[in-house]
Amino acid sequence: MSNKRVRGLAIHRPILYGSTSTPLTPAEKLAAPPDHTHKWTVAVRSAASLPLPSLSAISGASDGSSFEPGSEVGAINAASGMATPSSSSAAGGSAATVSTRGRDQEHDYHKMVGNKDDISHFIKRVQFKLHETYSQPTRNVDKFPFHITETGWGEFEIQIKIFFVAEANEKPLTLFHHLKLHPWLQNVAAVETEPPAPPAPSLPAPLPPADMSATNSSVEQDGQASTSANGTKQEAGPDSMEVDPTASSTTEQQTSTDAKVESTPVAEPAVATTEPLKPALPPVVHSWQYDEIVFPEPMEAFYDILSTHPPTPLPVVSALAFADPAAYRSYLYAKADAAKGNSTGPPPIPPHPLHTPTGYLFDALSLEAQNAEGERLEMARIAAIKDLEKGREQLIKAEKALKDARNRIAALNNAALASCTAVSGTVPPAS
């Protein structure tokens, strides 16, 4: 192995490090400690990702289903409403359209960011240092994929140490990531776990027993009326009483109407109980940091390894990062409407919201997103330069005003000293 370095050259490799967290499902809660609320995965991955699954694939709905423009919340709500009728058919339809990162029927969100390329050709080991409350808080992962999955209830800082292969002859790289379990978006975090209840109808006052019996008799009469309407004629028994047909028909119509009105409040709770509950939103929190590991003047053998394993280039536009480009386009339309002030609702959410650990939202991992980030940094640099120039001008004006004030004070002191000398003819003692 050659110990020579390639002089005057640097090579870099993009990586993603961060975490993905989801609330525990009822099945996962059985195996987790009672106080744990979330399942999270911390990992070091390649920046390139497979296309994210479409919203229709995640929800199990048909490809023609429509959701709220630019919102993943609509897809999740559709998933909660369509998961119960036929889970087998929904799973079959989803498996045909979802990518390999979501190949499981439950759509494992923990595999949906990065990890398209195998990075074990230049990373030998990744060490994760968890909170001390976990058993064996220092975890070493010696093979691809480099990730740790655990459950917990709190957020804490995780130390990530990356060890490179022997050919690199480089020291380990230490990174820090703050585990994120709860969303940054306040409008999404405020969504309740249950659907909004309809306004409660005004309940009538309790009826006396006589009215209850009248209601029961009206229901029976209504049943007799419907039977006679179908053409079935009932014969009166020997103990039956003859009633005026005109009066009986009027009474039947009135009592049947009352029964329908009184039965309306009773039917509403039945409909409300059959409606499936919506899950807590959002079900996934992506907190990832894009970074590039730079190797200045690498070893010749290591440079050959990196050259023979080039990283997969990122998509040109953000829409190509999703399996359903229409979902991203609808988000852009909703975002443009919100910027113009046409929308009065909450700000639109990308189909798969990704955040940096600082809470900054970016749409996808693409060259378009990189250019947008570069433009944002350039605008911030220009704004900082403008503020610096403005502050410099204010400082120059303040220094000039201070100099003028000092000159004025000195002139006043000299004038006062001259007047005192002229009056007394002696110099006043220095104070």
From Swiss-Prot:
Region of interest: Disordered: 80-113, 193-274
Cellular component, GO annotation: cytoplasm; NuA4 histone acetyltransferase complex; nucleus
Compartmental location: Cytoplasm; Nucleus
Annotated keywords: Activator, Chromatin regulator, Coiled coil, Cytoplasm, DNA damage, DNA repair, Nucleus, Transcription, Transcription regulation
Ranges of biased composition (kind: Pro residues): 195-209
Biased composition (Low complexity): 80-100, 246-257
Gene3D superfamilies xrefs: YEATS domain
Domain of life of the organism encoding this protein: Eukaryota
Major location (coarse): cytoplasm
Subunit structure: Component of the SWR1 chromatin-remodeling complex and of the NuA4 histone acetyltransferase complex.
Domain notes: The coiled-coil domain is required for assembly into the NuA4 complex.
UniProt-recorded name of the protein: Protein AF-9 homolog
UniProt organism field: Mycosarcoma maydis (Corn smut fungus)
